[in-house]
From Swiss-Prot:
Residues covered by region (Disordered): 176-207
Active site: 94
Cofactor(s) the record lists: Zn(2+)
EC annotation from Swiss-Prot or TrEMBL: 3.4.24.-
MF GO annotations: metalloendopeptidase activity; zinc ion binding
Protein name: Putative metalloproteinase 165R
EC top class, as a word: hydrolase
Amino acid sequence: MKINTTDVRTAIYHSLQQWQSVSLLTFKEEYYDENADIKVSFVKGKHNDGWDFDGKGRILAHAFFPSGSMRGVVHLDYDEDWDFASLKQVLLHELGHTFGLGHSSDNKSIMFPWNSSSVDNVNQDDKNGIEWLYGLKNKWAKLSPPVTKPPVTKPPVTKPILTTVPRFPVPTTQVPIIQPRFGNPTTHSPTTRHPLQKIPIQPRFGHSNPPIRYNPPIRYNPKHPLSPPFKSIPNSLLNVVNSSITNLYVYFPNTWNSSIIKFN
């Protein structure tokens, strides 16, 4: 391990301060585990979380996303030769996972999955990611999406090979189906000038109540006589009623005797 408790606490403090400086998150140290949202510990080999360490080299640490029973947990491999710089860098990465960030495809990002000693600060992509999750540090700033993908349910692992753990949760909420505000239309046909309840139209195809459309009164215009398009209808009509199912037209001349005509 090769690192003392004071350096560990200082590395944790500085790592959290970096994330706090670019986000709306705030942190304070707790002395009791049950009060802490984030817990950092050194463990060896098998440690009962399904993600065993492999001794010195390769896997350095892992952390869990902020959901489930292991949320906020950071495990560091006790067998590694830690110093202040390496611990701070790994903590920056793993703490990002506890906030909900996955691996970044930006090789200058602290969330890039390959461990690089040249990257020891959060960059713009990291800032975009944390603001995407928790809001803008500056309320007047423009929110920019990060270049990474949503996280999967498994905890990301810091190791010297490229992994494909995405960053943000895959949305499951479906677009709501908008129901008609007033239900199905119930408005009846407009009332005509004369009662037409007893029109002798016979239904076809077994329909007992064929829909009937009431047309407004047709006034004769000498310039546009009705006889050319409707050769069976007199020039002077009072009203016409049409059934959309039977295709029957009932026309009313200037008398009360109705006539029924079918147009193909």
